[in-house]
Design a protein with these regions (language model features):
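N-terminal low-complexity or amphipathic/hydrophobic leaders
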Residues: 1-18
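A contiguous pocket-lining binding segment that forms or flanks enzyme active sites
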Residues: 78-126
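Conserved catalytic-core motifs characterized by acidic clusters
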Residues: 1, 30-37, 157, 175-176
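A short, ordered amphipathic alpha-helix with a cationic face
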Residues: 3-7, 73-76, 102-104
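Short alpha-helix boundary/capping elements
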Residues: 7-8, 23, 112, 141
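Internal, conserved structured core segments that host functional sites
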Residues: 12, 17, 24-93
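Short, solvent-exposed segments of well-ordered alpha helices
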Residues: 2, 41-44, 48, 102, ...
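C-terminal auxiliary extensions adjacent to catalytic cores
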Residues: 106-176
C-alpha cells in the first residue's frame, strides 16, 4: 500500500521533479521542490532525517563533482535526501526511470531488511517478499514518472502519528 499511496510514492514524484529541474538548470524549481518536500513531511523527526541524509549526500556529491555545488547551494540551508539524490543522478545524466526504480527499491529493501532483523523473518522470506513486491515497485515507478503536480499527495496509515510518538521516545532502536 505504501508504494502505491504512501509518502514514498510522493517522494518518487518529487525525485522526478528535482531531476528535471537539474536537467533544465532551473535552480528556482529545484529550491521550490526542496521547500515543498520539507513542508510536506509530517513530523520534525522525518524532516530532520531527510535533511541529515541530504546533507551527507550533498557533501559527498560536492566532493566528487564540484559542479554540483551551485545546485546544492540553490536548496538553501537544508537539502532533503530525495532532492540530493535526484540532483546527483541528473548531473551524472543517469536514465531517469532507472534512478526512480533504484530509489524506490532502496526504500523497499531497507524496510524488508529491518523486518528480517527485528521480527525475524529470515533472509529467504525477505527475498521472497522483495520479489513479490516487484509489481508494486513497477507501478510506483510508473506513477512517479507520470504523475501531475495537482495529484501529489499520500496516505501513510498513521505514519505521522507513529513518527510523532517515536520522536519523543527516550531510547530508540534506529536513528531517525
Amino acid at each position: 500500500m505504501e508504494l502505491r499511496y504512501g509518502a514514498i510514492a510522493t517522494e518518487g514524484t518529487v525525485l522526478v521533479r528535482a531531476f528535471d529541474a537539474v536537467q533544465n538548470q532551473d535552480l528556482e524549481t529545484l529550491r521550490y521542490w526542496n521547500q515543498w518536500w520539507s513542508a510536506w513531511r509530517d513530523t520534525e523527526e522525518l524532516r530532520n532525517q531527510s535533511w541529515q541524509m541530504g546533507r551527507s549526500l550533498c557533501r559527498l556529491g560536492g566532493a566528487l563533482e564540484p559542479g554540483l555545488v551551485p545546485y546544492v547551494q540553490a536548496c538553501g540551508e537544508v537539502c532533503n535526501f530525495v532532492i540530493a539524490f535526484g540532483t546527483i543522478a541528473a548531473y551524472w545524466q543517469l536514465p531517469l526511470p532507472d534512478v526512480v526504480s533504484a530509489y524506490l527499491y532502496s526504500w523497499l529493501s531497507n524496510g524488508i531488511n529491518a523486518g528480517v532483523r527485528l521480527i525475524p523473518l529470515g533472509q529467504t522470506l525477505g527475498q521472497q517478499m522483495l520479489l513479490a513486491l516487484h509489481p508494486s515497485l513497477e507501478y510506483a515507478t510508473h506513477k512517479a514518472l507520470t504523475q501531475e503536480d495537482q495529484d501529489l499527495g499520500g496516505w501513510s496509515h498513521g505514519m505521522g502519528m507513529i513518527s510523532s510518538q517515536h520522536e519523543s521516545l527516550y531510547t530508540r532502536l534506529f536513528q531517525s
